[in-house]
Amino acid sequence: MINEIQIAAFNAAYAKTIDSDAMEQWPTFFTKDCHYCVTNVDNHDEGLAAGIVWADSQDMLTDRISALREANIYERHRYRHILGLPSIQSGDATQASASTPFMVLRIMHTGETEVFASGEYLDKFTTIDGKLRLQERIAVCDSTVTDTLMALPL
């Protein structure tokens, strides 16, 4: 059985990858045919599929990081994830559906720190070669207001 400890460890490694700017590793947390979406609670509750960020493959996630590194121009900043404990809704030895609350602080190059996003990850995990991978991650943000500077993944 996939358990909460495995998912919590996975989420900690996921957050550390983003927070430490090891972005090129971020897509490896997902399956090849994954779905990743950042949306808000109102859109999610209404069943609206479109999100602020939307990708339907690991290749799209890799392209997002390439654009972040090579093409996009944005004010230098970094994130710090604060994660709650995961709750498994269903699962077996190779798959699990879980939710995990999150808060992301954004630290600007000036040192200014603010709450950038809070919400809940809605995840579908699978195992590949004995390792957890995300088949789907929907980051449902509590606020309907999103800063246009969402360059880094949640």
Curated annotation (Swiss-Prot):
This enzyme's EC code(s): 1.14.12.15
Keyword Membrane: no
Catalytic activity entry: terephthalate + NADH + O2 + H(+) = (3S,4R)-3,4-dihydroxycyclohexa-1,5-diene-1,4-dicarboxylate + NAD(+)
Activation/inhibition comment: Inhibited by EDTA.
Protein family membership: Belongs to the bacterial ring-hydroxylating dioxygenase beta subunit family.
Subunit note: Heterotetramer composed of 2 alpha (TphA2I and TphA2II) and 2 beta (TphA3I and TphA3II) subunits. Part of a multicomponent enzyme system composed of a reductase (TphA1I or TphA1II) and a two-subunit oxygenase component (TphA2I or TphA2II and TphA3I or TphA3II).
Protein name: Terephthalate 1,2-dioxygenase, terminal oxygenase component subunit beta 2
Gene of this entry: tphA3II
